[in-house]
Swiss-Prot record:
It is an enzyme of class 6 (ligase). Belongs to the class-II aminoacyl-tRNA synthetase family. One of its GO terms (biological process) is alanyl-tRNA aminoacylation. Transmembrane segments: none annotated. The gene is alaS. This is Alanine--tRNA ligase. InterPro entries: aa-tRNA-synth_II/BPL/LPL, Ala-tRNA-lgiase_IIc, Ala-tRNA-ligase_IIc_anticod-bd, Ala-tRNA-synth_IIc_core, Ala-tRNA-synth_IIc_N, Ala-tRNA_ligase, Ala_tRNA_ligase_euk/bac, DHHA1_dom. Zn(2+) binds at H565, H569, C674, H678. Its EC number is 6.1.1.7. Its main location: cytoplasm. It comes from Gluconobacter oxydans (strain 621H) (Gluconobacter suboxydans). GO terms for cellular component: cytosol.
Length: 879
C-alpha cells in the first residue's frame, strides 16, 4: 500500500525533478492578507506573485500546503464527520508556474505523474475543460489521448477561476477518477454528478486573463499556472478506498480515539471518532502556527473546532481531558513532514488540555440546559435563538456546536433569533465608533509608493543623512507646502536614517533641518511594507517637496531602543533554554524606556524560573560577544538554526542577527531573522532586569524588563524605596525584610485576638442578651462591625451553648446590615430560620434571604436591630 507520506514525497520529488523549487508549506495564518482567516488554498502564499506585487528567485514552484477551511466563505465544519470527504484541515499539493510554462506543460506534467509515476489506469481518468477553452481540449487529446467522450466541457463558473472582481483569472481543467459502474453517480456536469463514482483529484488553473476594474478583460502578458490536488482525496484512490477517513493517516487517528475512549471505531460512535480525528489535525496545526483559543477572530474559530471535538469525546464517555492524549498519534503520522508539530508539542498539548479543562466544567451544565429546553418545547422543532445564545454566552457553546448536538436529535435552531440576540449584545457592549478614514489613507501610500518607489533605509550604518523631501501629507491630502504650526504632517524622504516602527521596535524620533527650516519628528512608521513615513511638526520656516534636508535621529533614544531590542533576543533564547522550546514570541515592544515580550506559555513562570532567565541573560551580556548581521536566503538561515518569528513576513533574502557565544551545535547563542537595529556587542546592553510577569490571554504570558540606563534607574529607585521603608521601620536596610515579616506575624496574632474577643463578646461573657419567650430561649445581639462571614460561625457557636432556642446576630459592616438566624434542631418543626430571616430582611430593606430551616442569612441597606429583634420576640410569643 502507498502511504500518505509516500504520496506527498513522490509528488514533491517529481516536480522537483522538473525544475520546480520545493517550497515548504506556509503558515496557516496568511501573511499580510487581512481578507483571509486562514490559508485556504495552495496558491494563497503565492497570491502576490501572481498579481505582480512580489517577485521570487524562481519561476516554478511545488508545495504540499497546509489548509484550514473552518470559517467564512470556505467553511466545512458542519459536514465534518458525516461525509466521506469533508475536512477542516487538509493538505493541498500543487505545482505553480509564474510566467514560465503554460497549458501544454501543465497537462503533460499531470498526466505523466498520474499514469507513469502513480500508476493510475488511463481508462479510469477523464478531464473537464471550460466550454470555450478549445486549446485545453485539444491538448488533452494530443498529450493524454483522451477521446471526446472523456473530455467534458463545462460552461459554468466551476471551470473558470477568478481571484476576485479584478485581477488574474482563467479557465480550469479538472481531472476526475472513475470508481466504476458499481458505484452510484454520473460524470461531472450530469444530473448525478454528486454521486461517489467520479471523484475530482486535480484542478489545473490556466491564468491567462486579467479582469480590469472597468469590467474589461485583457490577456496576461505572462500566463501562469496554479494547480491543486487534495492529498487526502488522492490517497484514498491510491489506497483503494472511497472514503478519506479510511486512509492510513486518518485511520490511525480514528483507531487512537477508539483505543482511548474504549469505543469501537466503526460502532455507534463512528461519526464522533471521525470528528475527533479531523479536529485533532486542525487544532494541533493551528496552535503550532501561533493561533491560540480566544473569543474572537482566528482564536475563536480554533475554539469552535476544539469544543466540537470535546463534545464528541464527552458523548463517548469522557469525564476528564483526553483530547490532548491523542497528540502523540498525530505526531507519529505527520511529525516527520511537519517538524513544527514536534517543536511545539508541549505547547500544543498544554493548550489543548487547558481548554478542555475550562470547557468540561461548562459542558455538562450547558447540555443539561439544552436537554431541559428541548423537553419543555415538546414537539416544537426549532430551539429558540435566545436559548442558543444563552448557551453561547454563558456556557461557551459556539452556535455550530449547539447545531451539532441538535442534529443528533433531529432538531434545528432558530438562527435568526440567535443573530438577533447576538446583535443586541454587540449593541450594548460596543462603544460608539466612527471610521477614521484609515482605508482612504492607505490609498495615499499606495499612490506614493507607485510614484516614488520604496524608501531607502540608511539607519543600519548611519544616524544622519542628507535627503530630499518627496512628499508632504496631512490625512489623505498631499500638500504643496507645510508652514510652521501645530498640525502634524507626514513626510516622505528619498532616503532616511529613521527606523520605521516594525518588528516590535518603535520608530525613531529626531529632526529634519534646512536653512531656515526645522521639523521635529516624533514618530516614524512603515506604510505598505517598504515606505518609511516621518510624522512631526514644522517648528520653523516652511517645508516644501523637493527641498534638501538634513535628517538626524535622536541618538540617545535610538541607543536605548536598540539595547532593549538586543536584550529581547537574548531573553527569547534564555526562555527557550530555561523553560522549554515551546516558548515562542507572540508579540513584543522595544521602546527606549522598557521592553515587553509576549510568549506562548500556558502557566505563570515561577520566581525561581524568572531569576534563572534573568541570570542567564546577564551572563551572556557580560561575555560581551559581538553582534553579527548577515544577509542570506531564508532556507540558509533556517538551516543555520535561525528562528523565524510568528506573524512576520520575510522575503527570500533575509537579515539574520546573531549574538552571544555559540557552542558545538550553534554558531551563536541567539540567531533570529530580524530587520531591527541592534548593539555592536552584547556588553553595550548593560545590566538587565525583569520587572514583571503577567497573563495576557489563555496560553500567553507577558514579561516586562529594562536594561542599560533604564535598569540602573530602576535599581536606584528600588534602593531609595527600600531605604524609605527601612527608615519607617527604624531598622537597617538589611533587616527590613525580617522586620516586615515580624510585623505581619504580629498582625496575624492581633487579628486572631480580636476575633476571639468578638466571639467572647457574642457568646455573652458579661454581656448576656439572652431571654426566654414562650418557653423558647432567644439570644439576640447586635455585634456592630463584624463581617457577615464571621456572623455565621458565631451563630453556630452560640447555638451549641444554649442547646435549645433561637440565635439572631446582626452586624453593620461596610455600610450594609447583615443578619444570621439559627434555630436549634429541636425547634425546626415550629420555627423556620429561612422564613424568619426573610421577615427580618424586609425590615432591613432587603430582598429576601436564604439558607436552611436551621440556619439562614440575609442582608439589607438598613441595620435597625431594635425593629428586627422586636419582630422576633412577637413571632416567638405566637409560636
Amino acid at each position: 500500500m502507498t502511504s500518505t507520506n509516500d504520496i506527498r514525497s513522490a509528488f514533491l520529488e517529481y516536480f522537483g525533478s522538473q525544475g520546480h523549487r520545493i517550497v515548504p508549506s506556509a503558515s496557516l495564518v496568511p501573511q499580510n492578507d487581512p481578507t483571509l482567516l486562514f490559508t485556504n488554498a495552495g496558491m494563497v502564499p503565492f497570491k502576490n506573485v501572481f498579481t505582480g506585487q512580489e517577485t521570487r528567485p524562481y519561476s516554478r514552484a511545488t508545495t504540499a500546503q497546509k489548509v484550514v477551511r473552518a470559517g467564512g466563505k470556505h467553511n466545512d465544519l458542519d459536514n465534518v464527520g458525516y461525509t466521506a470527504r469533508h475536512h477542516t484541515f487538509f493538505e493541498m499539493m500543487g505545482n505553480f508556474s509564474f510566467g514560465d510554462y503554460f497549458k501544454p506543460e501543465a497537462i503533460e506534467f499531470a498526466w505523466t505523474l498520474l499514469t507513469r509515476d502513480f500508476g493510475l489506469p488511463k481508462d479510469k481518468l477523464l478531464a473537464t475543460v471550460y466550454a470555450e477553452d478549445e486549446d485545453a481540449a485539444d491538448l488533452w487529446k494530443k498529450i493524454a489521448g483522451l477521446s471526446d467522450d472523456r473530455i467534458i466541457r463545462i460552461g459554468t463558473s466551476d471551470n473558470f477561476w477568478r481571484m476576485g472582481d479584478t485581477g488574474p483569472c482563467g479557465p480550469c481543467s479538472e481531472i476526475f477518477y472513475d470508481h466504476g459502474d458499481s458505484v452510484f453517480g454520473g460524470p461531472p456536469g450530469s444530473p448525478d454528478e454528486d454521486g461517489d463514482r467520479f471523484v475530482e483529484i486535480w484542478n489545473l488553473v490556466f491564468m491567462q486573463f486579467l479582469d480590469q476594474p472597468d469590467g474589461s478583460r485583457d490577456a496576461l502578458p505572462r500566463p501562469s499556472i496554479d494547480t491543486g490536488m487534495g492529498l487526502e482525496r488522492f490517497a484514498a484512490i491510491m489506497q483503494g478506498k472511497r472514503d478519506n477517513y479510511d486512509t492510513d493517516t486518518m485511520r490511525a487517528l480514528i483507531e487512537a480515539s477508539a483505543e482511548i475512549m474504549h469505543q469501537d471505531a466503526d460502532g455507534p460512535f463512528k461519526a464522533s471518532h471521525r470528528v475527533v480525528a479531523d479536529h485533532l489535525r486542525s487544532t494541533a496545526f493551528l496552535i503550532a502556527d501561533g493561533v491560540l483559543p480566544s473569543k474572537e477572530g482566528r482564536g475563536y474559530v480554533l475554539r469552535r473546532i476544539m469544543r466540537r471535538a470535546m463534545r464528541h469525546l464527552h458523548i463517548m464517555g469522557a469525564k476528564e481531558p483526553v483530547f490532548y492524549r491523542l497528540l502523540p498519534a498525530l505526531i507519529q503520522q505527520m511529525g516527520a513532514a511537519y517538524p513544527e508539530l514536534v517543536q511545539h508539542q508541549a505547547l500544543i498539548a498544554q493548550t489543548m488540555k487547558g481548554e478542555e479543562e475550562r470547557f468540561t466544567a461548562l459542558l455538562e451544565r450547558g447540555l443539561t440546559l439544552l436537554s431541559d429546553e428541548l423537553d419543555r418545547l415538546g414537539d416544537k422543532e426549532a430551539l429558540p435563538g435566545d436559548v442558543a445564545f444563552k448557551l453561547y454566552d454563558t456556557f461557551g457553546f459556539p452556535l455550530d456546536l449547539t447545531q451539532d448536538a441538535l442534529r443528533e436529535k433531529g432538531r434545528t435552531v432558530d438562527e435568526a433569533g440567535f443573530e438577533t440576540a447576538m446583535a443586541e449584545q454587540r449593541k450594548r457592549a460596543r462603544a460608539a465608533w466612527v471610521g477614521s478614514g484609515d482605508a482612504a489613507a492607505e490609498t495615499v501610500w499606495f499612490d506614493a509608493r507607485d510614484k516614488h518607489g520604496p524608501s531607502e533605509f540608511l539607519g543600519y550604518v548611519s544616524e544622519k543623512a542628507d535627503a530630499e523631501v518627496q512628499g508632504i501629507f496631512r490625512g489623505n491630502d498631499e500638500l504643496a507646502s507645510a508652514p510652521a504650526g501645530d498640525d502634524t504632517v507626514a513626510i516622505l524622504l528619498n532616503q532616511t536614517p529613521f527606523y520605521g516602527e516594525s518588528g516590535g521596535q518603535v520608530g525613531d524620533h529626531g529632526t529634519l533641518t534646512a536653512p531656515g527650516v526645522r521639523v521635529e519628528i516624533t514618530d516614524t512608521q512603515k506604510r505598505n511594507g517598504d515606505l518609511i513615513v516621518h510624522y512631526g511638526k514644522v517648528v520653523e520656516g516652511t517645508l516644501k517637496p523637493g527641498m534638501a534636508v538634513h535628517a538626524e535621529i535622536d541618538h540617545a533614544r535610538r541607543t536605548a531602543v536598540r539595547g532593549h531590542h538586543s536584550a529581547t533576543h537574548l531573553l527569547h533564547e534564555a526562555l527557550r533554554r530555561q523553560i522549554g522550546t515551546h516558548v515562542t514570541q507572540k508579540g513584543s515592544l522595544n521602546a527606549p524606556e522598557r521592553l515587553r515580550f509576549d510568549i506562548s506559555q500556558p502557566r505563570p513562570l515561577t520566581d525561581e524560573e524568572l531569576a534563572a532567565v534573568e541570570a542567564e541573560v546577564n551572563a551572556r551580556i557580560r561575555e560581551n560577544a559581538p553582534v553579527e548581521t548577515r544577509l542570506m536566503t531564508q532556507e540558509e538561515a533556517v538551516a543555520e538554526g535561525a528562528m523565524a518569528l510568528f506573524g512576520e513576513k520575510y522575503g527570500d533574502e533575509v537579515r539574520v542577527v546573531s549574538m552571544g557565544k555559540g557552542d558545538d551545535d550553534r554558531p551563536a547563542y541567539s540567531i533570529e531573522l530580524c530587520g531591527g537595529t541592534h548593539v555592536g556587542r552584547v556588553g553595550e546592553i548593560g545590566p538587565f532586569r525583569i520587572v514583571s510577569e503577567s497573563g495576557v490571554s489563555a496560553g500567553v504570558r507577558r514579561i516586562e524588563a529594562v536594561c542599560g540606563l533604564a535598569a540602573e534607574a530602576l535599581a536606584l529607585e528600588t534602593e531609595s524605596r527600600l531605604k524609605q521603608i527601612a527608615d519607617l521601620l527604624k531598622v537597617p536596610v538589611a533587616d527590613a525584610a525580617s522586620r516586615v515579616a515580624a510585623l505581619l506575624e504580629e498582625r496575624k496574632s492581633l487579628t486572631a485576638q480580636v476575633s476571639d474577643l468578638q466571639r467572647k463578646l457574642a457568646t455573652g461573657e458579661g454581656t448576656s442578651a439572652t431571654e426566654s419567650i414562650n418557653g423558647i430561649t432567644l439570644s439576640a445581639r447586635d455585634l456592630g462591625d463584624v463581617s457577615p462571614k464571621e456572623l455565621k460561625g458565631l451563630a453556630e457557636s452560640i447555638s451549641k451553648q444554649i442547646a435549645s432556642g433561637v440565635v439572631a446576630l446582626m452586624s453593620s459592616a461596610d455600610g450594609r446590615g447583615s443578619i444570621v438566624i439559627a434555630v436549634t434542631k429541636d425547634l425546626t418543626d415550629r420555627l423556620d430560620a429561612v422564613k424568619l430571616v426573610r421577615e427580618a430582611s424586609a425590615l432591613m430593606g432587603g430582598k429576601g434571604g436564604g439558607g436552611r430551616p436551621d440556619m439562614a442569612q440575609a442582608g439589607g441597606p438598613n441595620a435597625d436591630s431594635d425593629a428586627v429583634f422586636a419582630m422576633l420576640r412577637k413571632t416567638l410569643e405566637a409560636a
